[in-house]
Structures are given as C-alpha cells and as structure tokens.
Amino acid sequence: MTTYNLRLKAKDELTPHPSVQYWRKCQVEELFAMPFMELVFKAAQVHREHFDPQAIQLSTLLSIKTGGCPEECEYCPQSARYDTGLEKQVMLDIEEIVEKAKIAKQRGASRFCMGAAWRGPKPKDIKVVSEIIGAVKALGLETCGTFGLLEDGMAEDLKQAGLDYYNHNLDTDPERYSKVVHTRSHDDRMDTLGKVRHAGLKVCCGGIVGMNETRPERAGLIASLANLDPQPESVPINQLIKVEGTPMAEAEDLDWTEFVRTIAVARITMPKSYVRLSAGRTAMSEAMQTLCFIAGANSIFYGEKLLTTCNPEEDADCLLMQKLDLYPLQYQEC
C-alpha cells in the first residue's frame, strides 16, 4: 500500500510562494476573538479581493447509497451503530441518478455531488460510480463524490471517469477527532486527501461545528483546513443537525454569531476557496444567512434534501437570492 499523506504545512516547510501563509492555531483564535463587526468587515474585504460578492455557486447533493454505514461517527444518522429510524437502502439506479441530476441543472445547480454511506468503496463500487460520474458529467455539470476512504489507484480511476471534486471532510479539530469519530483516525482522512491530490482531483474539505466543541477547537479545525497544502478549492462549513438516536442529539446549540464568525475566519484564512454554507441552513434565518454571505460564504447546497436531512426549498433560496441580488455561477465560471 502506498501512502500519499497530504501533510499539513509546518512553519519551516513552506514552499516559496508569497500567497501561502502558515496559520498557527493561536493566530486563528485571535481572529475568532476580534470584535464581531470588525471580523465580518475584514472577511468581506478579503472576499471582494478574490470573488464577485454577488456571485454564488450552487451545488446539489444526492445520497446514491443510504444508511448501513459501518463507521461510528457520533454526528451521523447513517451509522449502522445507531438507531435513528433510517432504513438502509441499496444504491440508486443510474437512470434515477441521472434524472435527478437533470432536474438539479434545470433548477440552476452547476455542481452535482454524490454521496455513498461506505467506510470506503470496493473496486466493484468504483466501476459503478465511474459510470455514474460519466453520465452526470455528460449533462454539463461539475461532479463531486464523497465515497469515504480510498485505496491505491481509486482516485485515479475517479479522475479518469470525469470526477472534478472529491469531498473528504476533516470533521473537527484534530486534537478531538477521536472523541467524535471512533472507527477511523485523522491520519486516515489525511491519507485519502493525499491520494486525491496525487490524482489531480480538486479537493472539497470542511467540517462540522456545533458538536459541543470549544472556540479554540473550532480554531483548530479552521487551522487544519487552512494549512492543507494546497488549500481546498471548496470548504463546506456544516452546522450540526441533531438527529435523535445519535450521541450528538443532545448537543448544546451553537450561538448564531459563533457560526458567522466561523465563516468569516474560514474566508480570511482561505481567501481563494469557495466557502459553502452546508448542512443546518433550515435552522438559519434569512438575516443570519445574509451575514454569512457578507462574511465570505459564496456557495450553498441547493435542493430540498442533504443526504438524509432537510434543506431549504429551492423557491425559498431563489427568493433570498433575489432579495440580495445574488446570481448563480454557471459551470464554466466556477
């Protein structure tokens, strides 16, 4: 087995590119501690240096294989170890997936993301998803896959099939990873990210907040993302959706200002990445989402469902974008 470990940048290992900055955890904590208005203003300035502030990238996420996952992640309703009422389902037929991708494109999405509840795919699974990727790509959509830990050669196969992005989140602060996920390590995640980069795929990598972590631990998550070299092209920031039956069902609610701070700090530390408002938007007011856009979020998951949980309806998102004069990016613009 070859290990392609995507290393976190160390201060004395930086490549000689002036745009690259190493972020100490304490520096990220200092950003979190800025006065709220100053932090949002700074993030908005950084955002405008690299993006059109009126542009937003729309992704649609579909679970192509739901439930029965052998992993033990305390936040996830798809784990077979928790009784959440979710029924295990076989993989969707390619015809059904393509039809949903067509609908997503018609409604304005430029990227179609597909997730499967595996610890990692088997070689036979890669053959199936490669066919699916090719069919979705032929529609004129960007493609993204989240299929778990990859073995040698799998990332290359996905790249050859036409996959654009591979999603593999770091979930939480590396120092508390084992407290949240019990069947894999942070190093396992880093190894797959290394394989993905080695294959020439773009990286979608973010995390989840609201899992009873402290602010310094949120800073640790952002620092671990910002110090990936190169930085992820796409950074999804999820607010925990508490699902009955999971250990995180009783997690304490995260104050909304702390979530906006997280978006702002992600924008400042990863200035050229797309920062996506991901899970948890159903609990966010329009005003809160607007502040997130001002603070540098420029992507959302668009569609009524995220894997197994609810998402705002398309009509509501379209209305909000109209109110804010936001326009969706097309595939070639992303």
UniProtKB/Swiss-Prot annotation:
Pathway in which this enzyme or protein is active: Cofactor biosynthesis; biotin biosynthesis; biotin from 7,8-diaminononanoate: step 2/2
Give the reaction(s) catalysed. (4R,5S)-dethiobiotin + (sulfur carrier)-SH + 2 reduced [2Fe-2S]-[ferredoxin] + 2 S-adenosyl-L-methionine = (sulfur carrier)-H + biotin + 2 5'-deoxyadenosine + 2 L-methionine + 2 oxidized [2Fe-2S]-[ferredoxin]
Q: How is the cofactor bound?
A: Binds 1 [4Fe-4S] cluster. The cluster is coordinated with 3 cysteines and an exchangeable S-adenosyl-L-methionine. Binds 1 [2Fe-2S] cluster. The cluster is coordinated with 3 cysteines and 1 arginine.
Q: Please, one GO biological process term?
A: biotin biosynthetic process
Residues involved in [4Fe-4S] cluster binding: 69, 73, 76
Cofactor(s) demanded: [4Fe-4S] cluster; [2Fe-2S] cluster
Task: Indicate whether Metal-binding appears among the record's keywords.
Answer: yes
Pfam families assigned: BATS (PF06968), Radical_SAM (PF04055)
Identify the residues that bind [2Fe-2S] cluster.
113, 144, 204, 276
Q: Where is the signal peptide?
A: none
Q: Name one GO molecular function term.
A: biotin synthase activity
Q: Does the keyword 4Fe-4S apply?
A: yes
Question: Which residue intervals define the domain Radical SAM core in the entry?
Answer: 54-281
Subunit structure, briefly?
Homodimer.
NCBIfam families reported in the protein's UniProt record: bioB
What does this gene product do?
A: Catalyzes the conversion of dethiobiotin (DTB) to biotin by the insertion of a sulfur atom into dethiobiotin via a radical-based mechanism.
The family annotation for this protein states: Belongs to the radical SAM superfamily. Biotin synthase family.
Q: What is this protein called?
A: Biotin synthase
Report the source organism: Haemophilus ducreyi (strain 35000HP / ATCC 700724)
Print the organism lineage. Bacteria, Pseudomonadati, Pseudomonadota, Gammaproteobacteria, Pasteurellales
